[in-house]
């Protein structure tokens, strides 16, 4: 069975993304990120998704990656807890921004996990 997405939750890029986490000590250029982000939105629209654009969060350089603090599955969302201290607080903000999209909201209160740590295959999560 295939799940058909109807909505995309996307955050506008912020200028502080240049200070985001990087394993290679890279500093992305805001102008390039903005152009790539516009193309990303166009691609989502071309496949028929409704774009739900969230405002920038300058105090959180990596907040453009909305999949890290929130894992969505059908009508459910789990607000996650990223390990890096620079991301503490993103979950509290995104839960307020997206709660109206979901029937059920759950929270990771102990331990650390972010969306990039989780793989969904059919109805199974690893």
Locations of the language-model features?
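The feature marks the mature, well-folded catalytic cores of soluble enzymes
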Residues: 1-126
């Amino acid at each position: 069975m295939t799940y058909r997405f109807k909505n995309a939750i996307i955050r506008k890029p912020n200028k502080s993304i240049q200070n985001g986490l990087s394993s290679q000590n890279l500093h992305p250029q805001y102008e390039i990120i903005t152009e790539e982000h516009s193309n990303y939105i166009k691609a989502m629209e071309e496949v028929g998704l409704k774009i739900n654009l969230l405002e920038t969060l300058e105090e959180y350089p990596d907040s453009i990656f909305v999949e890290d603090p929130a894992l969505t599955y059908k009508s459910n969302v789990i607000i996650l807890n990223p390990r890096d201290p620079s991301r503490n607080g993103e979950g509290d903000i995104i839960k307020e921004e997206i709660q109206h999209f979901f029937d059920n909201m759950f929270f990771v209160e102990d331990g650390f996990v972010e969306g990039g740590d989780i793989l969904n295959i059919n109805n199974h999560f690893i």
